[in-house]
């Protein structure tokens, strides 16, 4: 069981303010190439995804995350012309991270690339992350955490994971929450992967601002995206991080 964070009150406001202070003092940091894989399985209760609990002493510590991490030089894959293949390299990194962090095997040929996330400039560490999804290969009982970067794991239905965030039991970064929110509509792995395969991968370059209700993450198409002003009129494509309930809006035509 993944343990929840202590001191939940105003944690999103506090985290954003700390990020903003760091940005004011040090400026924007360079993007770090990274990859993650959402490992899925079918159960009698529906689709479940593997959630890992990050060590509180490292980047994104204490949060519920998917297997993943930075892309290493050793992950590099070359195309048929001998040039670096960015997507294949990211997939190789995701496979490696799943094995290292949780002893989980995924088939790189069966993974679906469905999103890429670019963090806002305010973040102190900025991982530009390829998001893949894959069905679990083998026995779910074979999951074994590394007990270093990862301190616990749990299989969760996506809606249960977001509900537990709202209840203060776990913490989720916006890309994780958005992915779980997307997966919550599916009852089986085949349906989720088929829709991801059929759609163009989504690109999220996040802009973030503070409001009285909580931090707001905005993406392209939101009326406040270009000016980084969440009060601007227009369409909404954003996640408002209210303490007891994250609220996603997308009314783009």
Spans of features found by a protein language model:
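N-terminal leader/linker segments that precede catalytic domains of diphosphate-processing enzymes
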Residues: 1-150, 156-253
């Amino acid at each position: 069981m993944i343990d929840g964070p202590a001191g939940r009150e105003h944690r999103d406001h506090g985290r954003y303010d700390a990020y903003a202070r760091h940005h004011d003092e040090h400026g924007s940091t360079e993007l770090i190439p990274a990859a993650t894989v959402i490992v899925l399985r079918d159960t009698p209760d529906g689709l479940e995804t593997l959630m890992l609990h990050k060590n509180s002493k490292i980047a994104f510590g204490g949060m519920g995350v998917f297997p993943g991490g930075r892309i290493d030089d050793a992950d590099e894959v070359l195309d048929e012309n001998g040039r670096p293949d960015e997507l294949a390299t990211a997939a190789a990194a995701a496979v490696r991270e799943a094995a290292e962090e949780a002893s989980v095997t995924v088939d790189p040929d069966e993974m679906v690339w469905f999103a890429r996330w670019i963090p806002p400039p305010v973040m102190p560490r900025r991982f530009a992350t390829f998001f893949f999804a894959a069905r679990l290969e083998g026995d779910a009982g074979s999951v074994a955490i590394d007990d270093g970067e990862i301190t616990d794991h749990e299989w969760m239905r996506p809606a249960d994971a977001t509900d537990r965030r709202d209840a203060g039991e776990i913490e989720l970064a916006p890309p994780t929450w958005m992915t779980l929110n997307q997966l919550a509509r599916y009852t089986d792995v085949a349906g989720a992967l088929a829709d991801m395969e059929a759609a163009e991968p989504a690109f999220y370059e996040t802009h973030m601002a503070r409001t009285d209700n909580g931090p707001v993450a905005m993406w392209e198409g939101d009326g406040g995206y270009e000016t980084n002003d969440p009060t601007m009129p227009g369409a909404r494509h954003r996640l408002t991080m209210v303490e007891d309930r994250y609220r996603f809006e997308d009314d783009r035509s």
